[in-house]
Amino acid sequence: MKETSPIPQPKTFGPLGNLPLIDKDKPTLSLIKLAEEQGPIFQIHTPAGTTIVVSGHELVKEVCDEERFDKSIEGALEKVRAFSGDGLFTSWTHEPNWRKAHNILMPTFSQRAMKDYHEKMVDIAVQLIQKWARLNPNEAVDVPGDMTRLTLDTIGLCGFNYRFNSYYRETPHPFINSMVRALDEAMHQMQRLDVQDKLMVRTKRQFRYDIQTMFSLVDSIIAERRANGDQDEKDLLARMLNVEDPETGEKLDDENIRFQIITFLIAGHETTSGLLSFATYFLLKHPDKLKKAYEEVDRVLTDAAPTYKQVLELTYIRMILNESLRLWPTAPAFSLYPKEDTVIGGKFPITTNDRISVLIPQLHRDRDAWGKDAEEFRPERFEHQDQVPHHAYKPFGNGQRACIGMQFALHEATLVLGMILKYFTLIDHENYELDIKQTLTLKPGDFHISVQSRHQEAIHADVQAAEKAAPDEQKEKTEAKGASVIGLNNRPLLVLYGSDTGTAEGVARELADTASLHGVRTKTAPLNDRIGKLPKEGAVVIVTSSYNGKPPSNAGQFVQWLQEIKPGELEGVHYAVFGCGDHNWASTYQYVPRFIDEQLAEKGATRFSARGEGDVSGDFEGQLDEWKKSMWADAIKAFGLELNENADKERSTLSLQFVRGLGESPLARSYEASHASIAENRELQSADSDRSTRHIEIALPPDVEYQEGDHLGVLPKNSQTNVSRILHRFGLKGTDQVTLSASGRSAGHLPLGRPVSLHDLLSYSVEVQEAATRAQIRELASFTVCPPHRRELEELSAEGVYQEQILKKRISMLDLLEKYEACDMPFERFLELLRPLKPRYYSISSSPRVNPRQASITVGVVRGPAWSGRGEYRGVASNDLAERQAGDDVVMFIRTPESRFQLPKDPETPIIMVGPGTGVAPFRGFLQARDVLKREGKTLGEAHLYFGCRNDRDFIYRDELERFEKDGIVTVHTAFSRKEGMPKTYVQHLMADQADTLISILDRGGRLYVCGDGSKMAPDVEAALQKAYQAVHGTGEQEAQNWLRHLQDTGMYAKDVWAGI
């Protein structure tokens, strides 16, 4: 057990504890001083209780782990609850109204929502500009005062369509006076002794009066909106009054709406006004930074009032704001509590009764994170977001409890500071020295400057300028569209694929989309569709997988044709090949892609780029990305093309329109699937087993036939849990009907152009729990404006990190979206990035000789602790099928594998079957067929089944196998790997013990079948067979390998193992 250390504490003063060390008017400055003396962690005791203050970035990283810590509403925040109640800022995470309001209001603070607020923000900013422009020469500007007026009016107008008209008042609005006094009183209450508090009768009376003043204003805003009815407003108040929480279906009650409005009026203007004031101060004290800011503003803000797009282009202004928040975060601390007793820093014990305060100004000055110049004002440190120190920048709080209005504040502040610099020269006529003023937030105290107009002409900023500019921007964008590749001369690209499970097809369609969006004419098709029709104009790209060394079902005919044509027949064809494979099948890895690549060259085609390989058990996406880069570069060189840098490089976009009606998924058509029904669904494991294996009988449609050894493909349904998670994350309802439209081929799996419910769309069309790809993670990062969170996401796609943190833990894009709530990815883009829902293939475990109208499958239910360490992982198809009941519908199709996995035509041919666990499935069908043949009077060759399981509890089909053995249909050899009192035994061990028998059977022309795990079991079985061959025939290793390969090439050895591509 590790030794713990006491948390440092400054000197105490009797019953007052450390209270005398805290300046009641500027407590944050006192804590900063103590942190400089005590270090990155210390504790203070006051009559109000004990607080652990943390400021070192490594310790902050620990306490910001939301699995271990959550936001605490104590101290000053607890006092603020007197007038903000369970609003977003002052509610506990476990309170129902926090989650409800968070779900309802998140969309109104997204980056996209800022576009709707932009015009109103300009409206208020223009009032500030006009006020300053009308000042007399040398007349002082109260910077914090005017910024407070601006930010209050902005949140009032944008959030509630209420005008405080602060610039038309001689004195602040009564709400402001009451709010400032109430916040100040809340801060001081926590520093007073109970006896002091009781004696302050007048102060308490004023506190109640100020609260009632705020309540009266807010209640009147709500009442007026209700009286006027729905005027199609899209602001905060409209959502609070009209929108239901997608999770509970409930609306916010009027009391909570009151608390939310007060919360936003406080948080929405206090912090932003402080930010603008600090930024102004820093610019005046750093003329070189001010000069750069003026240069950017003059270059970008060319209209009277900035457009939304122009504000986004003010990158240096945003850096100034970020750096101002670093040095003086206007919300200087946030409080946390541990969910259970723990240790931080490897030695400091924290109990559930402790309260932790993250001291943000000191965190932002941590030299270990920010470097030796941490005290300096240097906006350039935010130029490259990937260099912002991890967990060392928290101006908006942490995680799901971070400030919901961050985007609102930053857009408003960027717009306002840009406009100020566009129109005014700032003058520090008083040579101001910074004096921090604190209520619950920080701002410069008594800060005055003077301004001079930078332009002699009168300032007439047009409030509508931003909107008027929009059509022009759109026109420019439309005119810019066109080919981004010069020299195509209408030459096409044909992308062909061979794919059984969808991976290769998905890659092919993505390649076609990419080319199409660069102005290239493209087509996609299965390889079998282009037999004898490879074009000699343009380029051909082939993406294909292998199945045990055999081509996919939609590529087999093409491979055969390619093999039969004469050399020289494909002269003039220009091609490139990318192969999908799995290195666990080393003997056949990339066999088909390699064969196609070599055959094309041999038959006269020209390879314009080297073949690429993607390993689905490795870094498939990284390998694909590298190949795509080189392939496109080679194509440009080979065909004499040039890149048009001025072309529109927009991605394929998916649009979504809400409608009413019904819809269906097109995936069933793409696999020629049919609707069937479940006839029986029963458990095969014993009652005391901790696993689940289902035997499922499926009543087939009239026109569907199968044979033993075939596969039954199932189009599964995503779990309701995961569908609900997505709907909740995006604030949508599953019952809503939408119509999708798309410009690219990669959306072909979606039900385009017809109504479909969001529930059905997410249930039947896309993979939602696959590990996130690097491309998906990069997209998530691009939609995340919170610098620390964006940096975290960007780091996840790095070499090594991606494999360890995403692939091995099977972290999905949905998991990441839930973790990073600041990610503002639109639902349409999320949907577009999800891969098509792939069919799951099961070996049929029955024989049509018993019942041709019914087929069974044997499904091992995948269910267990998630590799991510969070919750339970459930396989999509196996759990979907496990829950189906007799009579339920299932979408299915039959596929005959290319591996010749069928019974010998001559029933007297001896057979060896190896199938542990659910690998026994196809052999059950074989044995049923042999049973029928025997009853028909046919003579059977000997048959051996090597079955494996852990113990008697998961010995599936035991009764049937024992009956087949009793009836002389088969000899069963069972290996138990976890049976008490017996050594651990696998099927290959039993086969090694019976080497003479097995080799004798195979030498006499017997057939060998192996079904099940291809990564471990199948290679071990093959190794055992090769050793047996060596031992029996006295040969070497190479001869044994050649023998086994010959068996496979001649069809005497067939495998039904899964590569997952």
Swiss-Prot record:
Temperature dependence: Optimum temperature is 51 degrees Celsius. However, enzyme stability is dramatically reduced at this temperature, incubation for 30 minutes at 31 and 49 degrees Celsius results in 61% and 17% residual activity, respectively. Incubation at 60 degrees Celsius leads to total inactivation of the enzyme.
Positions contributing to heme binding: C403
Signal peptide: none
EC numbers: 1.14.14.1, 1.6.2.4
Stored CDD domains: bifunctional_CYPOR (cd06206), CYP120A1 (cd11068)
UniProt subcellular location: Cytoplasm
Family statement drawn from the similarity comment of this UniProt entry: In the N-terminal section; belongs to the cytochrome P450 family.
PANTHER family in the cross-refs: NADPH--CYTOCHROME P450 REDUCTASE, NITRIC OXIDE SYNTHASE-RELATED
Official protein name in the record: Bifunctional cytochrome P450/NADPH--P450 reductase 1
Provenance organism: Bacillus subtilis (strain 168)
Gene name linked to the record: cypD
